[in-house]
Regions:
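Amide-donor transfer/coupling interface in amidating biosynthetic enzymes
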Residues: 1-119
Length: 119
């Protein structure tokens, strides 16, 4: 099991063109059995769903995959576009509530922390 580098967050999906589609069931089974799924599109309760939760119709709500080492990550949402709370479409309400960084920052700070401790 790979380390969890990001909890539930809301990195932005900028478009709906990119999505995971497997060439066959054997490939999909291999990806799942080997824990290559790094991120999924889920609602606030952690449940998979259709649009708008899964904005591109990605198979099994998969948003990101890793390689066998966990060091290579392919990710469809764009956390780099949400490192400041002011980049969120509802930033004025969120900022007034808790004055925090954008959710996209979490993936980067947790990845750096993991690398510093383990690599």
């Amino acid at each position: 099991m790979r380390p969890r580098i990001c909890g539930r967050s809301s990195p932005r999906a900028e478009h709906s063109e990119g999505k995971i589609v497997f060439k066959d069931e054997q490939t999909q089974r291999h990806i799942n059995e080997n824990n290559y799924v790094a991120f999924k599109y889920v609602d606030k309760d952690g449940n998979k769903g259709g649009f708008p939760v899964n904005p591109n119709g990605s198979t099994d709500s998969i948003a990101g995959l890793t390689d066998a080492t966990g060091r290579v990550l392919g990710l469809m949402p764009h956390p780099e576009r949400f490192v400041r709370i002011t980049q969120h479409p509802h930033w004025t309400r969120l900022f007034a509530k808790d004055k925090r960084e954008g959710d996209g920052t979490t993936i980067f700070t947790n990845a750096v922390s993991y690398a510093q401790k383990n690599l």
